[in-house]
C-alpha cells in the first residue's frame, strides 16, 4: 500500500512526512497540516521530543493518504526502513518518482 492518491471527501487529508534534522538524521511522522507541524517541530514544545534537540528541521518528503489509519500504517513501514533506504525514498521523490516505484517500501501483506 502506498499513500499516492486520495479520493475526494470532506475529511482532511493525512500526510506522512520525513524531515531532515540539523544533525542530518531523519524523522518520520504524520499530520493533517504539514506547515503547522514543521513550525511545531522548529519552534514549539509540541514538536516531537526527538526533533527538539535537533532543530532546525527541513521537510524532505511527503505522501498524501486517505485517512489516519493508512497514514499510520505507511509511517510504520517507513520507520522500519534503514536510514539508507529512507534516503533513497527521499531522493526518488525529488526526481519525481513516487513510492509506487518502490514496492519493497509498501506494507507487507497489502
From Swiss-Prot:
PANTHER family: UPF0213 PROTEIN YHBQ (PTHR34477:SF1). Belongs to the UPF0213 family. Residues 12-88 form the GIY-YIG domain. InterPro entries: GIY-YIG_endonuc (IPR000305), GIY-YIG_endonuc_sf (IPR035901), UPF0213_domain (IPR050190). Gene3D superfamilies: GIY-YIG endonuclease. It holds the Pfam family GIY-YIG. CDD domains: GIY-YIG_UPF0213. The lineage of its organism: Bacteria, Pseudomonadati, Thermodesulfobacteriota, Desulfobulbia, Desulfobulbales. This is UPF0213 protein DP2720.
